[in-house]
Curated annotation (Swiss-Prot):
Name of the gene encoding the protein in the UniProt record: psaA
Matching PANTHER family: OUTER MEMBRANE PROTEIN, OMPA-RELATED (PTHR30128), PHOTOSYSTEM I P700 CHLOROPHYLL A APOPROTEIN A1-RELATED (PTHR30128:SF19)
Note accompanying the cofactor annotation: PSI electron transfer chain: 5 divinyl chlorophyll a, 1 divinyl chlorophyll a', 2 phylloquinones and 3 4Fe-4S clusters. PSI core antenna: 90 divinyl chlorophyll a, 22 carotenoids, 3 phospholipids and 1 galactolipid. P700 is a divinyl chlorophyll a/divinyl chlorophyll a' dimer, A0 is one or more divinyl chlorophyll a, A1 is one or both phylloquinones and FX is a shared 4Fe-4S iron-sulfur center.
Positions bound to phylloquinone: W709
Composition skew (Basic and acidic residues), residue ranges: 8-22
Disulfide bonds: none
GO molecular function terms noted in the UniProt entry: 4 iron, 4 sulfur cluster binding; chlorophyll binding; electron transfer activity; magnesium ion binding; oxidoreductase activity
Species, as recorded: Prochlorococcus marinus (strain MIT 9301)
Protein name in the entry: Photosystem I P700 chlorophyll a apoprotein A1
One Pfam family, short name: PsaA_PsaB
């Protein structure tokens, strides 16, 4: 890809003196109206049906539009604003449904008995069956997004506030759309502005993250926490009194702007009304009533304390603002990313790379795919961490006792994390093919890793086989012993124990640290509630339901965790092989010249199919799907069995055999979705069937070759010609790569929607 050279006279200018180019691409509607306008070939219009597939494949592949890195970067930057606009429209729709069609007020008044609903189905051909009685005189579809719980945490107390948010989000969407057009067509940043890494880090860390977190802390402190205190007191049956008036219902509560009145807020949090004098005199203890470190869960709501959440965002915002200023920008002080990387040398014994990290700064700064790969890997990992925190540290009021929401958010964040991590492998592969120049990376760490790729992949392959045979072998052994009537010879907590001693040790050191200074790192003892209850803590019950409880680990957990390890390692093996062998291999030394995606190395070279970096991503998606299916099945059964008390604690003895998973999890828990007809959850029965069909439909694309279909099309076209209705656009069978793309998409969508229906019908069906 070419890099646009600086314009004449600009080389000596500082980036921030003239960061944009005015009117680089005037809007040309005649051009934009033409599908495929970026390509001379596609813009001529379709001659065969392959045209529509190429249009989809290349529409967002900005690299191939012009080959100019600056132009591609501007398109990415502009597209970010478009993405934000879509997000704001989506948020607006959620707020609007909450304002007009939901039972938010009814749920807010009685969150332990009323179920959240935000949509009512019209009676056209009997769909009113789907409207369940959710309580508080409301019939509608039960939702499990956690959005009501989040709104309560924000401090939203009525539908008028939701409507204001809906309007505000639409306005923000319009602003974002305008910004996207403006920063591409009217004032587009120059390449030097995008490459000013230290300034970018400064603004992103201190500005977006730091000030964003600080602003949110302000909302939590002034609106969220006081509202939560009033609502919690109502729910606990001991309402607060403000100005001599008992706040017994939501209707009695002060308006949000009134909470900023020191006279009113001082009756909820005296420290909040004490003014800024305490801040500047460093008497910060005066603020300890609304900036707390209580730990544990609020016993009324089963969620983190809002005052703890406020404290967290304040502290994080301050840290990010300080951290964002450690890079060298205008004043010649601070860190230079290039200097840091260039000075990092490889270990001379373990990892001898004479040139260390030299060249990495330029590669990361110039390759958008390399940046995206790193960001996707990190964001995917963060998403998986979020999924675990949703049950271990429930952030929103009453969310912990809404079991379908807990399971739904866990599943959602696991899928998102998995897709992002596979995306990281995809864009790392593209970076290697399109952006990596071997001549610039001689004897640095990237070069050394590529030279050691055979050792890395063969060892990783050995690890995968070891984990796969041993972990699956434990299950096969147990199934065999149970079939032969020899329970004493099974791996279980009551026979041959395989206790997860390291995981149990981690749990115990967390619990034993309470009352000591072991983990806190200070002389002050760790308070009793500073740790999640899942670490050998105590049970918290809200409204007669378990919100959180200790999660015991045993032989069954060790066995399934080794299945997780096996599947994660295989997914990584496929992705890593796709990256390390993206440019060349012993089989195809000139792979880089074939590009990121190609079906085979041309006719006449057998055995060279499915070797492109794209094909590795294709295969990794299946392993990612299987891996996460087992993860979410494990979580669902474990929580129902050992925490929520829904299956009588059968996980430890039933999940140690393959038959147990099939009989006591899949079959037993599918009873709700299979018998859902005639009930409000009947749409999940239909979805279960339909999603199975979509999944099965994928096999048609994955198992058959294009020749079969082209042969069929030829005879169908012949029949059309006979009838004088032949199409002007010539039918073409999908290419090998297109068929795989359509196949894996239907496989994933069908599988995910099947699981969606299975989980929802199960927990909604149990009530």
């Amino acid at each position: 890809m070419t890099i646009s050279p600086p314009e004449s006279g600009e080389k000596n200018k500082k980036v921030l003196e003239d960061p944009v180019k005015a009117d680089p691409r005037p809007i040309d509607f005649a051009k934009l109206d033409k599908p495929g306008f970026w390509s001379t070939k596609l813009s001529k219009g379709p001659k065969t049906t392959t045209w529509i597939w190429n249009l989809h494949a290349d529409a967002h592949d900005f690299d191939v539009h012009t080959g100019d890195a600056e132009e591609a970067t501007r398109k990415i930057f502009s597209a970010h604003f478009g993405h934000l606009a879509v997000i704001f429209i989506w948020m607006s729709a959620a707020f609007f449904h909450g304002a007009r069609f939901s039972n938010y007020s009814g749920w807010l008044a009685d969150p332990t008995h009323v179920k959240p609903g935000a949509q009512q189905v019209w009676a056209i051909v009997g769909q009113e069956m789907l409207n369940a009685d959710l309580g508080a005189n409301y019939n509608g579809i039960q939702i499990s997004s956690g959005i009501f719980h989040m709104w309560r945490a924000w401090g939203i107390t009525n539908e008028s506030e939701l409507m204001a948010l809906a309007i505000g989000a639409v306005v923000m969407a319009a602003l974002m759309l305008h910004a996207g057009i403006f920063h591409y067509h009217k004032a587009a940043p120059k390449m030097e502005w995008f490459q000013d890494i230290e300034s970018m880090l400064n603004h992103h860390i201190a500005g977006l993250v730091g000030l964003g977190s600080l602003a949110w802390a302000g909302h939590c402190i002034h609106i969220g926490a006081p509202t939560a205190a009033l609502l919690d007191a109502i729910d606990a049956g001991s309402p607060l009194v403000i100005n001599g008036k008992e706040i017994a219902t939501i209707a009695d509560m002060p308006m949000p702007h009134q909470l900023c009145d020191p006279q009113i807020i001082g009756q909820i949090f005296p420290g909040l009304a004490s003014g800024t004098g305490n801040f500047f005199s460093l008497n910060w203890l005066a603020f300890s009533d609304f900036l707390t470190f209580k730990g544990g869960l609020n016993p009324v709501t089963g969620s983190l304390w809002m005052t703890d959440v406020s404290h967290h965002h304040l502290a994080f915002g301050v840290i990010a603002i300080i951290g964002g200023h450690m890079y060298r920008t205008n004043y010649g002080i601070g860190h230079s990313m290039k200097e840091i990387l260039d000075s990092q040398q490889g270990d001379p014994i373990l990892f001898p790379a004479p040139k260390g990290h030299q060249g990495l700064f330029e590669f990361m700064a110039e390759s958008r795919h390399a940046q995206l790969a790193v960001n996707l890997a990190m964001l995917g990992s963060i998403s998986i961490l979020v999924s675990h925190h949703m049950y271990a540290m429930p952030p929103y009021p009453y969310i912990a006792t809404d079991y379908m929401t807990v399971l739904g958010l866990f599943t959602h964040h696991m899928w998102i994390g998995g897709l992002f991590i596979v995306g990281a492998g995809a864009h790392a592969g593209i970076a290697m093919v399109r952006d990596y120049d071997p001549a610039k990376h001689i004897d640095n760490v990237l070069d050394r890793i590529l030279k050691a790729r055979d050792a890395l992949i063969s060892h990783l392959n050995w690890v995968c086989m070891w984990l796969g045979f041993h972990s699956f072998g434990l299950y096969i052994h147990n199934d065999t012993m149970r079939a032969l009537g020899r329970p004493q010879d099974m791996f279980s907590d009551s026979a041959i124990q395989l206790q997860p001693i390291f995981a149990q040790w981690v749990q115990s050191i967390q619990a034993s640290a309470v009352g000591t200074s072991l983990l806190a790192g200070t002389a002050e003892a760790l308070p009793h509630k500073a740790l999640s209850e899942v670490f050998n803590g105590s049970l918290v019950e809200v409204g007669g339901k378990v919100a959180i409880a200790p999660i015991p680990l045993g032989t069954a957990d060790l066995m399934i965790h080794h299945i997780h390890a096996f599947q994660i390692h295989v997914t990584v093996l496929i992705l890593l092989k796709g990256v390390l062998y993206a440019r060349s291999s012993r089989l195809i030394p000139d792979k880089a010249s074939l590009g990121f995606r190609f079906p085979c190395d041309g006719p006449g070279r057998g055995g060279t199919c499915q070797v492109s970096s794209w094909d590795h991503v294709f295969l990794a998606l299946f392993w990612m799907y299987n891996c996460l299916s087992i993860v979410i099945f494990h979580f669902s059964w474990k929580m129902q069995s050992d925490v929520w008390g829904l299956t009588g604690g059968n996980f430890a003895q039933s999940s140690i055999t393959i038959n147990g998973w099939l009989r006591d999890f899949l079959w037993a828990q599918a009873s709700q979705v299979l018998t859902s007809y005639g009930q409000s959850i009947s749409m999940y029965g239909l979805m279960f069937l339909g999603a199975h069909f979509i999944w099965a439909f994928s096999l048609m694309f994955l198992f058959s070759g294009r020749g079969y279909w082209q042969e069929l099309f030829e005879s169908i076209v012949w029949a059309h010609n006979k009838l004088k209705v032949a199409p002007t656009i010539q039918p073409r069978a999908l290419s090998i790569t297109q068929g795989r793309a359509v196949g894996v998409t239907h496989f994933l969508v069908g599988g995910i929607a099947t699981t969606w229906a299975f989980f929802h019908a199960r927990l909604f069906g149990l009530g």
